[in-house]
């Protein structure tokens, strides 16, 4: 791209020079030559010291935009030189530098996006005309339903009520003791088993336990009486509740793309080890024609729990029987 720019600049300069020569010959007046380097000469006074007519456009560009780390006249850009100075791309310092540069670039990009009215307009247009994705957003419908249930279903169980009341009383006692405020029911707490009972004798502990049991049984009796009264007088009363129920619609099945390597197991399949007694090439040969080592043959026979001499005898007997059958077939019959 830089070479094309050089060629275009040279071609334009030649055309302008030829046009000015023609105009001077016609009008016989000197005409000012507008060089491509005049803009750089006006903007960058530091470049005026050198002869810009002989300088290449690439050098002028690199000197004018010296602050840009992506443009370099030599072999490496300023950012690459800094990375090499830190010891290379694999060093910790170079990675920190690259991370810092990336964060700085993202921060600058966000600032420019906030200042740009075109970006805001594009984002508003995208929000208006973008359709919700069926895969990203689940299709749901909210319905209001009426549920009729008895009042007993909304009551707290008696055991939980007792635990909550005990917890409330403990918190009140702790707050009163912390604020040094005497309460009228502190004596009742001290008699009951809410306290640990440290420093009391065995008789006092038994009395406290009996009082606690009596207190619990009394509460249970009161609760049973309340339940009976409510069951007798309020059996017919029911309550209606309005609640929002969410029904998830049937989502479309996602099309999963499978690759050939995905179906393979992650661990490589174990190759069957070659064993001496296994199915090898020597099973294709006869025992006498096997071109292997005798030691391996011996190991094979030992693994099969056979002896070499017995196998040779059986094989020789089989050969003799086969030979006899062939001879019988070959002999003519005499009538």
From Swiss-Prot:
Q: Where is this region: Disordered?
A: 201-236
At the top level of its lineage, which domain of life is listed?
A: Eukaryota
**Signal sequence, renumbered to the chain:** none
Enumerate composition-biased segments (Basic and acidic residues).
Answer: 210-235
Role description: Dispensable for normal development and fertility.
Name of the protein in its database record: Uncharacterized protein C10orf120
Which source organism does the UniProt entry give?
Answer: Homo sapiens
Gene that encodes the chain? C10orf120
